[in-house]
């Protein structure tokens, strides 16, 4: 699979992201699943079967960006611009920073033939990391402790003798 459009940006965003990040690579395997990603790998099919998501931009795809994603009830639907009065203003704007991951999960789970495969950065939220939370908890507990080191403990009356 020789499709690297936007992959460099994805890697850069992953490296800059604080915390965990996941990058799914669509890799062809000629032994076990040859051609499984042809719908997005072949140049002639890629434009209609893949959507390149960029934060803050409308979710458009197709050879000339003639298709887009709209919300329909609790789901998504593919629409063609110009049909039924649909304009670019009706198309969803990608928000990778939204804390509510409902739409982002729907984008990640899209697959053909009814939907394009979402490529690019789907979700990029700032949240406390586990590591930061552990350090913060240690600092809070340490601040409340009566003794901060072993010497302070030994210099108190809270000691005992083993005989």
Residue ranges and their predicted role:
Residues 1-11:
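Single conserved hydrophobic/aromatic residue that forms the stacking wall/gate
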Residues 12-14, 38-39:
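Short low-complexity, flexible loop/linker segments enriched in glycine and/or proline
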Residues 19-24:
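A conserved active-site cap/scaffold subdomain adjacent to cofactor or substrate pockets
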Residues 27-163:
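Flexible, low-complexity linker and terminal segments
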